[in-house]
């Protein structure tokens, strides 16, 4: 019996372990909507949209900018700016420790990335929120990078686009974070005075101080399908009003139906459709229609 264990069973277990370890981590991804198990390389081809149920999964800010902007001529805006714990804030953890953990997890200094570049050859300034960095919360650096991007748009006489994904103002920066609502709104007012378009793209989720400021100030407000958009979350509202909310409440389709946003565009159509829209707003020749990615 012992020889059989040594000669047959143990090598079999070892071979099984080798097979398990040979499968790279992260090769498969489970759709949070339909539970389909998806092959990661195939999912990347669909821009992280489930091919089974069309669920638009959350993607990082750099991935967002990479699929939106032309490949050449990109320049990051405000990359040297880093958050500072001016208030020495502490809740269950020190704010500086939360920042360090978020920076290590995401590889980013803060929750917004801004770039100048081109879209189908048209100069453009673009911002994208990184939701993985403290819930995409807006603090001093997020506000400053957004304003710098707006200033680039003013200097270059080009449009500004922002992809929002945020839980709202950053609690750990208190009034400093709330001030960013006014600061970013003032920057957008300057763009409007100069006749330069701002397109706000709402992705899942957009809440709090971001939804109450820059995200809803677009000349055109676009959303991805089924994105959650609001000020307070549905559970908070239900507890306050003590009523059951309507089906699909705070989803982008609900907001479109009630006139709060202008259009819903699937992720694989955002680049060509926004390029054509911005060309019209900037009185430029419309770019050649791009093939829609499957």
Swiss-Prot record:
Origin: domain of life: Bacteria
Protein name (Swiss-Prot/TrEMBL): Acetyl-coenzyme A carboxylase carboxyl transferase subunit beta
GO BP terms, alphabetized: fatty acid biosynthetic process; malonyl-CoA biosynthetic process
HAMAP family: AcetylCoA_CT_beta
Cofactor(s) essential for the protein: Zn(2+)
InterPro entries in alphabetical order: AcCoA_carboxyl_beta, Acetyl_CoA_COase_Trfase_b_su, ClpP/crotonase-like_dom_sf, COA_CT_N, Znf-ACC
Alphabetized PROSITE patterns for the sequence: COA_CT_NTER (PS50980)
SUPFAM superfamilies listed in its UniProt record: ClpP/crotonase
EC numbers for this chain: 2.1.3.15
PANTHER family: ACETYL-COENZYME A CARBOXYLASE CARBOXYL TRANSFERASE SUBUNIT BETA, CHLOROPLASTIC
Lineage start: Bacteria, Pseudomonadati, Pseudomonadota, Gammaproteobacteria, Pseudomonadales
Zinc finger residue ranges, C4-type: 31-53
Subunit-level organization: Acetyl-CoA carboxylase is a heterohexamer composed of biotin carboxyl carrier protein (AccB), biotin carboxylase (AccC) and two subunits each of ACCase subunit alpha (AccA) and ACCase subunit beta (AccD).
Entry-linked Pfam families: Carboxyl_trans (PF01039), Zn_ribbon_ACC (PF17848)
Coiled-coil positions: none
Residues annotated as binding Zn(2+): 31, 34, 50, 53
Protein task: Component of the acetyl coenzyme A carboxylase (ACC) complex. Biotin carboxylase (BC) catalyzes the carboxylation of biotin on its carrier protein (BCCP) and then the CO(2) group is transferred by the transcarboxylase to acetyl-CoA to form malonyl-CoA.
Keywords assigned: ATP-binding, Cytoplasm, Fatty acid biosynthesis, Fatty acid metabolism, Lipid biosynthesis, Lipid metabolism, Metal-binding, Nucleotide-binding, Transferase, Zinc, Zinc-finger
GO cellular component: acetate CoA-transferase complex
Pathway stated in the Swiss-Prot or TrEMBL entry: Lipid metabolism; malonyl-CoA biosynthesis; malonyl-CoA from acetyl-CoA: step 1/1
